[in-house]
Regions:
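N-terminal amphipathic alpha-helix/helix-capping segment at the start of soluble metabolic enzymes
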Residues: 1-29, 33-42
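Alpha-helix-loop-beta-strand connector modules within alpha/beta enzyme cores
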Residues: 10-14, 60-88
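General secondary-structure edge motif
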Residues: 18-20, 51, 58
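Hydrophobic faces of well-ordered beta-strands that scaffold small-molecule active sites
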Residues: 26-32, 47-49, 86-89
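Short, flexible micro-motifs
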Residues: 32, 54-55, 62
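N-terminal glycine-rich anion-binding loops that anchor highly charged ligand groups
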Residues: 37-55
Length: 89
């Protein structure tokens, strides 16, 4: 994998600065690292990791069957490949 060198603290600072512009931020959802890299390449402002989308990717209905371990592991993998801030729901 191609990990980025940007520290999470710098991603937070970048996100706060984007929020301070009062512009509408475009934050599409990513369900895997490849999608996150494409989101960054296209030029979006951040990446959104949704439990519902992740459940769909795993073949589960969106009724709370994904575990905290599933979400945290996938979110970690996604955040490592992009310099964009990652919002996890």
């Amino acid at each position: 994998m191609h990990f980025v060198d940007k520290e999470p603290s710098q991603k937070r600072i970048d996100f706060i600065n984007k929020l301070k512009t009062n512009k509408i931020l475009r934050v599409p959802g990513a369900y895997n690292p490849l999608t996150a890299k494409l989101i960054e390449e296209i030029g979006y402002d951040a990446v959104y990791v949704s439990g519902g989308v992740m459940a769909n990717d795993l073949g589960f209905p969106d009724i709370g069957l994904t575990t905290l371990q599933d979400v945290s592991t996938r979110s970690y993998l996604i955040s490592r490949v992009t310099s964009l801030p990652t919002i996890v729901d």
